[in-house]
Amino acid sequence: MQSNHDSDASQAGDRPARPALRPLTPVEGRVLGVLVEKQHTVPDTYPLSLNALASGCNQKTARAPVMNVSEADILEAIDGLKGLSLVFEGSSSRVPRFEHNMQRVLAVPSQSVALLAMLLLRGPQTAAELRLNTARLHGFADISSVEAFLDELASHAPPFVVRLPRAPGARENRWMHLLSGEVSAAADADDADRTTGGATAAPGELEQLRAEQQALTEKVAKLQSLVEHMAGQLGIPVDEFLD
């Protein structure tokens, strides 16, 4: 029997080509990814204030690359995203708050939005890594479900994601979003080299190191989510805890 995940993802069909969005800037991509992430991880404080959005953009965990952007940079990115209808500002609060409109604009299911957000926040990842990293946004039944949605995203015209060539010594292909434009093989090779710090390691040792790093990252992310939730309940700016 076909799962709901797979049946949803198999509806790519013969859809008409959508109007292409202009490529997002790095800060626009980070802002969009943070809005999607925090919608699920800290729903009590969503839509996000500018301060909370800045904290999410600049946090040191679960981000690749780590950024240090100013509120002025974020406001400029928000203006650009508003022009694409990907972000809008809520009108029910005295403090400006922002939310994304990604699912409607891109016309993709929520599962695909979760995958795109994680690719925006963490860069190229395998389907297995995406299943793990999106756990707080959407619970995929298995890796095959993730791959089905990735294949569907890749089938759009123009595509939203691309499967990258397998890196030397890697067991799986990684996926990368195309919301910031096309990616070159050379650029991906540079990214892979930065990920490993240019070091050479045996495949088994490298896989173990990656697994250990991923486990630590997930623990820190869960603790951060708890802190963000508690700070929201207490009305305390979350950056006081994260600086």
Swiss-Prot record:
Q: Which family does it belong to?
A: Belongs to the UPF0502 family.
| Sequence segments annotated as region (Disordered) | 1-23
User: Which SUPFAM superfamilies does the record associate with it?
Assistant: Winged helix' DNA-binding domain
What is the protein's given name?
Answer: UPF0502 protein H16_B1091
Q: Which taxonomic lineage does the organism of this UniProt entry have?
A: Bacteria, Pseudomonadati, Pseudomonadota, Betaproteobacteria, Burkholderiales
Query: Which Pfam families does its entry note?
Result: DUF480
